[in-house]
């Protein structure tokens, strides 16, 4: 089916272009959401009549979206989740979680505006793109951590899996265990046991 786009649609075309799409996509998405009109002679004439109004509305919406993008751009959102020692999350962080975290920060976006290739399944930072308008995109940094303290360390760029403090504590534990366990003494006891038999 051929349709006339009433606004820019990602990976499809610009406003005013006549594009050929599958019937289901046209009926269930483009026409239903008023993003396009069927490309009939009558609708082509109708589009030409409302072209100036559509362009003016698009410029106005784009300006408002640019203001919102300025407010959002570069924000750092922290999401606290339970995770294993290796940093794998028990569950995942999805688009819905990001939208809720943004709303808690005073930013209202809808789920289709947040572009996330796959759910986040590990602790760390990830840049997420938000399409506020078909022509205006911005990004936020999502930090997933086990605690607020850990989130701060991740933001500073520390490698949380191999912290120096953890390595020092492990070395102290090994040294303390060495006081209770002397491998040479065990060898002497084993040798004494063999001679007694």
Swiss-Prot record:
InterPro entries: Ribosomal_bL9, Ribosomal_bL9/RNase_H1_N, Ribosomal_bL9_bac/chp, Ribosomal_bL9_C, Ribosomal_bL9_C_sf, Ribosomal_bL9_N, Ribosomal_bL9_N_sf. Residues 178-197 are annotated as: Disordered. It comes from the Bacteria. The keyword rRNA-binding applies. Binds to the 23S rRNA. It comes from Bradyrhizobium sp. (strain BTAi1 / ATCC BAA-1182). Residues 181-191 have a biased composition (Acidic residues). This is Large ribosomal subunit protein bL9. Belongs to the bacterial ribosomal protein bL9 family. Keywords: Ribonucleoprotein, Ribosomal protein, RNA-binding, rRNA-binding. The gene is rplI. GO terms for biological process: translation. One of its GO terms (cellular component) is ribonucleoprotein complex. GO terms for molecular function: rRNA binding; structural constituent of ribosome. HAMAP family: Ribosomal_bL9.
């Amino acid at each position: 089916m051929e349709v006339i786009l009433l606004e820019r649609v990602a990976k499809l075309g610009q406003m005013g272009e006549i594009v050929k799409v599958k019937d289901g996509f046209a009926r269930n998405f483009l026409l239903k959401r008023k993003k396009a009109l069927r490309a009939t002679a009558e609708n082509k004439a109708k589009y030409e009549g409302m072209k100036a109004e559509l362009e003016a509305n698009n410029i106005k919406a784009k300006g408002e979206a640019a203001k919102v993008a300025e407010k959002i751009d570069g924000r750092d959102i922290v999401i606290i989740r339970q995770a294993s020692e290796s940093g794998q999350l028990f569950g995942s962080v999805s688009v819905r979680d990001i939208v809720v975290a943004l709303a808690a920060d005073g930013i209202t976006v809808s789920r289709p505006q947040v572009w996330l290739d796959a759910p986040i399944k590990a602790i760390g930072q990830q840049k997420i793109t938000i399409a506020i308008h078909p022509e205006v995109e911005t990004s936020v940094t999502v930090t997933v951590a086990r605690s607020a303290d850990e989130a701060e360390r991740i933001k500073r760029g520390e490698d949380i899996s191999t912290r120096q403090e953890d390595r020092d504590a492990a070395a102290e534990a090994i040294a303390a265990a060495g006081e209770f366990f002397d491998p040479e003494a065990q060898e002497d006891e084993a040798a004494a046991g063999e001679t007694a038999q």
